Amino acid sequence: MNHQATDGFFFQHKSAIIKYMIRFGTGGFRGVIGQSFTKENVKKIAQALANVYHQENAKKPICVGYDFRSLSLESSVWISEVLLGNAIPVLLSKEPTPTPTIMEESKRFGNEFGVMITASHNPFNFNGVKIFEKDGMDAEKPLTDRLEKEISSLSGIKECSLEEGKRKGLLKENYPLEDYLNNILSFVHIKKKTPQTKILLDPIYGTGTLTLKKILTSMGFTNINEIHGGRDVKFGGLLPNPTKDNMEKDRAFFLKGKYDIAIGTDSDCDRIAVLDEKGEYVDANEILGALYYYLIAYRGMKGDIVKNIASSDLLDALAHKLGYVCHQVDVGFKNISAAMKEYDALLGGEGSGGLTMRGYIFGKDSTFATALFLEMVANLGKPVSKIIEESNKFAHFDKIVVEDSLSFENTGRPVYW
């Protein structure tokens, strides 16, 4: 049987591959590499997007980016070639980036659409395609439904090489990270310089290794160490998600090094996790709650907060005590972003570690969240545990954790990611 090897993966020849349906979930299209995530399917998604682009009479370039995963770079080229073949201008990143970088770029240029190649926090053998709408917002269901319908009725795929796209003036390539980081810095207001704060970073071999240390250094922090940095398409055997289990694996190293705070991020750097100065895991709801309290009580900002149904009532209690409203939406960060626009909310986030702020991008971003959290730590001059304690105490909130598990019968029906 014929096989192709890429980054240590072995894929069966296309004649042996089952035809998988392309379905978009709350985080875009995701699939196992060599099964549903194939060159053929990636190009189908690009052609469907091209069709919708022309149906909407869109005019601006489509920003295309990619992360560290296997086939991400190649897929960004496949996407671009199809868009160029449909006479659509493309702004293609020349460097791997976090997902929020392409969202920020799309928003900054006011683009109608954007594309990011990533499977976010999924295991190493997955990859995916995220589509962004106007101003860099995650694609909503009406758009993804249209894309699925277009895919099911495609009669062919138009393509154009990158070289030809350049000759036609349709393709521009750039390095978006610098502008992205400068935009984050415009939201940061540090009054107290605390370069001695000892910070441990764990990007879990994801694109956070490109941004976290840079942003903190620009903010004046100098005592920074990173573990699990650089690119490893298998993420060192770890699930590339800063879960409590993953963060607690860093605890011994953290305590031995006498760090003040640890920050963990997922593979495309849109989720954040924190260890306090005792090496204790800080719940994502408490991160969001502390930041909301800080922005209103200490920075004098105003506004409601948005959470999803999987988030804690801590946020409701805080909002009530502060004189604002906590709005609850369904799972999916695009629902949080939509509600933030509707209510002009100050902050929005979810219990899995994603958050954003009014005026910033319409999507979660852990580089931004890291900068905001370390601003809070610096300005308040308190250990992380005391900051969390203060916001919880203000809300009269106590946390009781009860762990349980569920099991499901294997029906043999396919599951789409």
Q: What residue ranges belong to the model's regions?
A:
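Aromatic (phenylalanine/tyrosine) cluster motif
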Residues: 9-11, 20
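Buried hydrophobic positions in well-ordered alpha/beta secondary-structure cores of metabolic enzymes
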Residues: 27, 64, 102, 115, ...
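N-terminal small/polar loop signature for handling phosphorylated ligands or for N-terminal nucleophile
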Residues: 51, 61-127, 215-275
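Proline/glycine-rich low-complexity loops and linkers
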Residues: 94, 149-182, 277-351, 356
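Gly/Ser/Thr-enriched, mixed-charge loops and adjacent short helices
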Residues: 127-255
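Phosphate-binding and adjacent anionic-ligand microenvironments
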Residues: 261, 301-417
